[in-house]
Amino acid sequence: MKEFQVYLELDRSLQHDFLYPLIFREYIYALAYDHGLNNSILVENLGYDNKSSLLIVKRLITRMYQQKHLILSANDSNKNQFWGYNKNLYSQIISEGFAVSVEIPFSLQLISSLEEAEIVKSYNLRSIHSIFPFFEEKFPYLNYVSDVRIPYPIHLEILVQTLRYWVKDASSFHLLRLFLYEYCNWNSLITPKKWISTFSKSNPRLFLFLYNFYVCEYESILIFLRNKSSYLRLTSSGVLFERIYFYAKIEHRVEVFDKDFPSTLWFFKDPFIHYVRYQGKSILSSKNTPFFMNKWKYYLIHLWQCHFYVWSQPGKIHINQLSEHSFYFLGYFSNVRLNPSVVRSQMLENSFIIENVMKKLDTIIPIIPLIRSLAKAKFCNVLGHPISKPVWADSSDFYIIDRFLRICRNLSHYYNGSSNKKSLYRIKYILRLSCIKTLARKHKSTVRVFLKRLGSKFLEEFFTEEEEILSLILPRASFTLQRLYRGRIWYLDIFYFHQ
């Protein structure tokens, strides 16, 4: 992105924040396809789902200068060829270039805010595991929690009208309406889920931009309501715009993204309410009374209905006590557990027994959803009994073992923060036995004969613990350090969670 910064600044200064002329720039399409100006991707004439070469882009720009090719109508057909390609291909190329250009004002604003705040970029700030230390620090002292699912989709005209406050180019909005008209029925106030699926697959970058902008607008109003509802100003949050190539952290506010599926981790905290969000699910928690939580519940409902014209049922937002309720977030079931302890103190001839109760956040692996996912992937049945993977039986032994080990290590890496590792050991056992059955199926043997031939140490990597790896790296590590790594470990290199 840095190599195109000069071009972006030049166009921005010449066009006075007009984005429409950017679709006539070749480097915009190079950004869209993640390759340089001197490179191209050769494609066959197979339709508009393929990547476009730079030669096609040059032809398209020439045609846009010469005629009104951007005017598409319902009479256009897939059979109408245009220099060997149909018009849907050109529409796809332009929409992806437009998705890049519409991100530029927000990206430039993010860069300037980073420079003003003198924030040092670090990849560790993107980790979604950074939210769990926040949970461990704050949630044991809170009383109530509420799971909130951000309603989506909304009517796309509302999105376009909201964008007009940030981008001054009216031509860009007419072009955006043109692209959206190809995928939905504008006569309906409720966008069907089928249209959302089609739109997200055809142009994921533009879809994610619109969705992230909608969430950003929603959270900006949420912060405004928070400041108006309290005499104490909220100082631990800020408004930044994050796209595919940018991230930032300001005090207690973290934004997280992934190149393939941009998703934002965002939270703020204050003495009254704590807010955490990942993708479309958010958590509201407070130490105050249920009345305070109900007030925020109806704040959100009226905000969605009156500002975004999205209907949300109040019964779907539940308010629960943290001590009696487990909430599901980022692949973990989390709850606050009471940990009683008894301390005996003796002073001269008198002894005292002091009972102390400490609250501790428990993070539990959801074993049933994980087994359901493994059963869907054909690693086991619905009861959790391991089965062979016949699809991989034709591959080499090294490939089969490597695939199983990779899945096992990824799961172990992510769920090493669990309070109880027994569920993780069960998942490892399922994958280990599934791997053995797959190899035995390939060699036309039984599991017992196969293990007897290879020995009992076969596939022991499945049960390799993190402290064993650390002992190889740090052979002189103390016993205290080894005990430390038997506990919960949160990693700062996990950038997204695939559900």
Swiss-Prot record:
Keywords: Chloroplast, mRNA processing, Plastid, RNA-binding, tRNA processing. One of its GO terms (biological process) is tRNA processing. It is found in: Plastid, Chloroplast. The keyword Protein biosynthesis does not apply. It comes from the Eukaryota. Pfam families: Intron_maturas2, MatK_N. Disulfide bonds: none annotated. GO terms for molecular function: RNA binding. One of its GO terms (cellular component) is chloroplast. Belongs to the intron maturase 2 family. MatK subfamily. Usually encoded in the trnK tRNA gene intron. Probably assists in splicing its own and other chloroplast group II introns. PANTHER family: MATURASE K (PTHR34811:SF1). This is Maturase K. It comes from Gymnocladus dioicus.
